[in-house]
Amino acid sequence: MAIERTLSIIKPDAVAKNVIGQIYARFEGAGLKIVAAKLVHLSRGEAEQFYAVHKARPFFKDLVEFMISGPVMIQALEGEGAIAKNRELMGATDPKKAEKGTIRADFADSIDANAVHGSDAPETAAVEVAFFFPGMNVYSR
């Protein structure tokens, strides 16, 4: 398997629960390295731009409102098969359907407040990492 990078966002609900460290421990326990990270409070414009792919979807407005409701922890993860590994750690989008022991099963409250975001493919990962971390701010280790 190839070394990949993926974007992960710990959403406002999980940041408010003070579980960033527990989520980071899961990333590292799965062999993923944090190669860039920052705690930010997204502006409406940033959230709308980042989630523009969902603009026509009925949940877009609520998603943007949720993502600007509090700080988020954004990180680029690197490792063998990082995209699939991160998605496995996250669990199903709906925490009620997420497998026991996944981030969403353990820390999310609803399909809307579902604790984390993760890139779904190599192409989106490249775009999403570049959105938050220009190349000079990502460091392989």
UniProtKB/Swiss-Prot annotation:
Q: Which residues of the sequence carry a binding annotation for ATP? A: 11, 59, 87, 93, 104, 114
What interactions and quaternary structure are annotated?
Homotetramer.
Q: Which UniProt keywords apply?
A: ATP-binding, Cytoplasm, Kinase, Magnesium, Metal-binding, Nucleotide metabolism, Nucleotide-binding, Phosphoprotein, Transferase
* Cofactors required: Mg(2+)
Q: Provide the primary localization.
A: cytoplasm
PROSITE patterns associated with the record: NDPK (PS00469), NDPK_LIKE (PS51374)
Is Phosphoprotein one of the keywords?
Answer: yes
**Localization of this protein:** Cytoplasm
Q: Which GO terms describe its biological process?
A: CTP biosynthetic process; GTP biosynthetic process; UTP biosynthetic process
Swiss-Prot/TrEMBL catalytic activity:
a 2'-deoxyribonucleoside 5'-diphosphate + ATP = a 2'-deoxyribonucleoside 5'-triphosphate + ADP; a ribonucleoside 5'-diphosphate + ATP = a ribonucleoside 5'-triphosphate + ADP
Q: Which Gene3D superfamilies match?
A: Nucleoside diphosphate kinase-like domain
Q: Which domain of life is it from?
A: Bacteria
Q: What class of enzyme is it?
A: transferase
Q: What Enzyme Commission number(s) appear in the record?
A: 2.7.4.6
Name of the molecule in the record:
Nucleoside diphosphate kinase
Instruction: Give the record's family classification.
Output: Belongs to the NDK family.
Molecular function, one GO term: nucleoside diphosphate kinase activity
On whether Nucleus is a keyword of this UniProt record, the answer is: no
Q: What does this protein do?
A: Major role in the synthesis of nucleoside triphosphates other than ATP. The ATP gamma phosphate is transferred to the NDP beta phosphate via a ping-pong mechanism, using a phosphorylated active-site intermediate.
Task: Show the GO cellular component annotation of the record.
Answer: cytoplasm
Q: Which residues form the active site?
A: 117
Stored InterPro entries:
NDK-like_dom, NDK-like_dom_sf, Nucleoside_diP_kinase, Nucleoside_diP_kinase_AS
